[in-house]
């Protein structure tokens, strides 16, 4: 919770096709972020790494972004069309991470 009258920023995170295995096998999370700061996907990825990424971070994060093979959809739109890491999150955004990396 933030310390002033600025509301928290509520967003929904979803994980699919194996990505959920890296996040405690939880497919959907509703999270509240500090509404006093600007939240981009870049900030969100850092927050996720520090707070909810529980298994093998190298399979999800590469440098400051997601690994190749992780699709990111924001409100059902490919993040590449929305500015990728620079996209500024808005209240009730739905961010879906889909793993296309499968062994065989």
Curated annotation (Swiss-Prot):
Annotated positions of the 1-thioglycine modification: 104
Cited SUPFAM superfamilies: MoaD/ThiS
Biological process according to GO: negative regulation of JNK cascade; protein urmylation; tRNA thio-modification; tRNA wobble uridine modification
Gene3D superfamilies linked to this entry: 3.10.20.30
Entry keyword Membrane: no
Positions of crosslink type Glycyl lysine isopeptide (Gly-Lys) (interchain with K-? in acceptor proteins): 104
One Pfam family in the UniProt entry: Urm1
Keyword Disulfide bond recorded: no
Keyword vocabulary terms for this entry: Cytoplasm, Isopeptide bond, tRNA processing, Ubl conjugation pathway
InterPro entries associated with the record: Beta-grasp_dom_sf (IPR012675), Mopterin_synth/thiamin_S_b (IPR016155), Urm1 (IPR015221)
Post-translational modification: C-terminal thiocarboxylation occurs in 2 steps, it is first acyl-adenylated (-COAMP) via the hesA/moeB/thiF part of the MOCS3 homolog, then thiocarboxylated (-COSH) via the rhodanese domain of the MOCS3 homolog.
Disulfide bond positions: none
Recorded GO CC terms: cytosol
Localization, UniProt: Cytoplasm
CDD domains tied to this protein: Ubl_Urm1 (cd01764)
Pathway of action: tRNA modification; 5-methoxycarbonylmethyl-2-thiouridine-tRNA biosynthesis
HAMAP family: Urm1
Membership in a protein family: Belongs to the URM1 family.
Subunit structure as annotated in this protein's UniProt entry: Interacts with cer.
Biological role: Acts as a sulfur carrier required for 2-thiolation of mcm(5)S(2)U at tRNA wobble positions of cytosolic tRNA(Lys), tRNA(Glu) and tRNA(Gln). Serves as sulfur donor in tRNA 2-thiolation reaction by being thiocarboxylated (-COSH) at its C-terminus by MOCS3. The sulfur is then transferred to tRNA to form 2-thiolation of mcm(5)S(2)U. Also acts as a ubiquitin-like protein (UBL) that is covalently conjugated via an isopeptide bond to lysine residues of target proteins such as Prx2/Jafrac1, Ciao1, Eip71CD and GILT1.
Protein's name in the database: Ubiquitin-related modifier 1 homolog
């Amino acid at each position: 919770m933030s310390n002033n009258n600025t509301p928290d920023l509520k967003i929904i995170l979803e994980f699919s096709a194996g990505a959920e295995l890296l996040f405690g096998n939880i497919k959907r999370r509703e999270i509240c972020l500090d509404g006093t700061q600007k939240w981009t996907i870049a900030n969100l990825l850092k927050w996720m790494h520090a707070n909810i990424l529980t298994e093998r971070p190298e399979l999800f994060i590469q440098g400051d972004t997601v690994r190749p093979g992780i699709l990111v959809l924001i409100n059902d739109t490919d993040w590449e069309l929305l500015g990728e890491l620079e996209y500024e999150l808005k209240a009730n955004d739905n961010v879906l991470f889909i793993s296309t990396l499968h062994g065989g």
